[in-house]
Design a protein with these regions (language model features):
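A glycine-rich phosphate-binding loop feature that marks nucleotide/adenosyl-phosphate handling sites
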Residues: 145-148, 229, 284-294, 336-345, ...
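Short, hydrophobic beta-strand segments
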Residues: 106-112, 301-304, 351-357
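DNA-contacting surface of Y-family translesion DNA polymerases
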Residues: 7, 181, 191-333
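Gly/Gly-Pro- and Ser/Thr-rich, intrinsically disordered tail segments characteristic of DNA damage-repair
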Residues: 1-225, 238, 361-395
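Acidic, metal-coordinating catalytic segment for phosphate/diphosphate chemistry
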Residues: 308-395
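Short, charged/polar surface micro-motifs in flexible loops or helix N-caps
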Residues: 13, 36-39, 295-298, 344-347
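Active-site-proximal helix-loop elements at catalytic-domain edges
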Residues: 1-8, 100, 245, 340-350
C-alpha cells in the first residue's frame, strides 16, 4: 500500500499572525524581527516584503535599505507558539500521525484517513479551508508518497497553494528541476555537481551512483536516491517518538554558529554520551538520528537505519556525520545539535565473528568498553577524543 504524505507550510507565519491581530497591516510589507537601528535580523517577512528581495536572516538594516516603507514588528513568540498549537489541534482532526518540524511546518501521514474525504486532494483542501476559517491563516500543502516529495511539492506552489507530486508526475514536475532545488543541496554541493556536468535532477538521476559515491562518499548515495524521488523516512507522531525506545543527547549553543569543525567535534561529544548510556544499559541500536535547529528556530531531524545493530561509537558518529546538511549549516547558523539512536534491543548475545579472522569491530568494541570503565572510575572527562577538543575548549 503506497503512503500518502502531506507537508503543511504556513505562509509567512509570523507576519500572517501579526496581520490577523492588526488587519491594518494586511497587504503591506511586514518585517518581523529586530529594528534596523539595533543590528537586528529578519525573522520572517510578508510576501509583500519578499518582492523586494527581503528574506529570513537578512540584517534589518539591509531590509530597510531595500524597502524603506516596510513596517517592522517586534514579534511575540508566545503568541506564535499558542497559534501553532491550535494549528496542530486542527491537523490532529485529520490523522493522529502528525510530525511538526518547526513552529510553522509539519508532516501528516494520511494513508489511513484520506479515503474518508474521497481523495488526498479533498482532505488537503478541507484542512486548508478549516485553518483559514478558524484562524484566518493560509497555508501551502504538498501531497506525495514520501516526505521528500511532499516538501518539494509544497515549495513549488507558495503561497496558499495545494500541489501534488506523485511518482507518475516526476517526469514532468521533478526531473526538470535545477539541482539547487533539491533539499540538502546547498551552494557548495551545487558547485561540485555542476563541475560534473550535473545541472538538473534528471542529470543527477542518470549519473552513475558509483561515481557519485566516489565524489561525495555516503552523501553521494543519498543524493542518487533523492534524485529518483525516493525516501522511506516515516512520519513520527509525538506519541510514537515517546513510545519508541530511544536515547539521545542535545546541546543548545551559547552562540549560534556555522563552524563545521566545532559542530563536528560537538557531535563527537554527544555521540560519546549516547554510546556511554547504550553500554551502561546494555543496548544495541539499529537507527541513528541527527537533529539540527537553526537560528530561525526551524528544525530538521534526519535518520538512517543500519544494516546491523551496534553500540560502536565510531559507527554511530560516522553515520551521524552523513546526515549533517553541510551546505545548510554553512549558510544558516545552528543553535542546537542533537545525536540519538532508536530501535534499541538488549545486547544479549555477543555478535558472531568469523573463525580465524581478527575482527576490527571486536577490537573497537573492546576499546570502547575500556574507555567506559575508565570514565566510570575517574570521571567522564578523564579520557576524551582529541577530535572533540575544539568543543571542549569552549566548556
Amino acid at each position: 500500500m503506497k503512503r500518502v504524505i502531506l507537508h503543511i507550510d504556513m505562509d509567512a507565519f509570523f507576519a500572517q499572525v501579526e496581520q490577523v491581530k492588526n488587519p491594518a497591516l494586511r497587504g503591506k510589507p511586514i518585517i518581523v524581527g529586530g529594528d534596523a537601528g539595533h543590528r537586528g535580523v529578519v525573522a520572517t517577512c510578508s510576501y509583500e516584503a519578499r518582492k523586494y528581495g527581503i528574506h529570513s536572516a537578512m540584517s534589518s538594516a539591509e531590509a530597510r535599505r531595500r524597502c524603506p516603507h516596510a513596517i517592522f514588528v517586534g514579534g511575540n513568540l508566545t503568541n506564535y507558539v499558542y497559534i501553532s498549537a491550535q494549528i496542530q489541534d486542527i491537523m490532529n482532526d485529520y490523522t493522529p500521525i502528525v510530525e511538526p518540524t518547526s513552529i510553522d511546518e509539519a508532516y501528516l501521514d494520511i494513508t489511513e484517513s484520506y479515503h474518508l474525504y474521497g481523495t488526498p486532494e479533498k482532505l488537503a483542501q478541507d484542512l486548508k479551508d478549516n485553518i483559514k476559517k478558524r484562524l484566518q491563516l493560509t497555508c501551502t500543502v504538498g501531497i506525495a508518497e514520501n516526505k521528500l516529495l511532499a516538501k518539494t511539492a509544497s515549495d513549488m506552489n507558495k503561497p496558499d497553494g495545494l500541489n501534488t507530486l506523485w511518482m507518475n508526475e516526476l517526469e514532468e514536475k521533478f526531473f526538470p528541476m535545477e539541482i539547487r532545488k533539491l533539499r540538502g543541496v546547498g551552494p557548495q554541493t551545487e558547485k561540485a555537481l555542476k563541475r560534473l556536468g550535473i545541472n538538473t535532477l534528471r542529470d543527477l538521476k542518470d549519473y552513475p551512483e558509483k561515481k557519485l559515491s566516489q565524489n561525495f562518499g555516503l552523501h553521494g548515495e543519498h543524493l542518487s536516491k533523492m534524485a529518483h524521488g525516493l525516501s522511506d523516512t516515516p512520519v513520527h507522531s509525538f506519541e510514537e517518538m515517546e513510545d519508541e525506545k530511544s536515547m539521545s543527547h542535545e546541546h543548545t549553543l551559547y552562540e549560534d554558529t556555522s563552524d563545521l569543525i566545532f559542530l563536528k567535534s560537538l557531535m563527537i561529544t554527544l555521540t560519546d554520551k549516547v554510546v556511554a548510556r547504550l553500554k551502561k544499559a546494555q543496548f544495541l541500536a539499529k537507527t541513528v538520528r541527527l537533529k539540527i535547529r537553526y537560528s530561525d528556530f526551524s528544525t530538521i531531524t534526519r535518520e538512517v537505519t543500519l544494516n546491523s545493530m551496534t553500540d560502536d561509537v565510531n559507527t554511530i558518529y560516522k553515520t551521524a556525520l552523513t546526515l549533517l546538511p553541510v551546505d545548510d549549516v554553512v549558510s544558516n547558523k545552528v543553535r542546537l545539535v542533537g545525536v540519538g539512536v532508536t530501535k534499541l534491543h538488549e545486547a544479549v548475545e555477543t555478535p558472531q565473528i568469523e573463525l580465524f579472522e581478527e575482527s576490527s569491530i571486536s577490537k573497537k568494541g573492546k576499546s570502547g568498553d575500556v574507555v567506559e570503565d575508565i570514565r566510570d572510575k575517574f570521571g567522564k572527562f578523564s579520557i576524551v577524543r582529541a577530535s572533540s577538543l575544539p568543543y571542549r575548549w569552549e566548556h
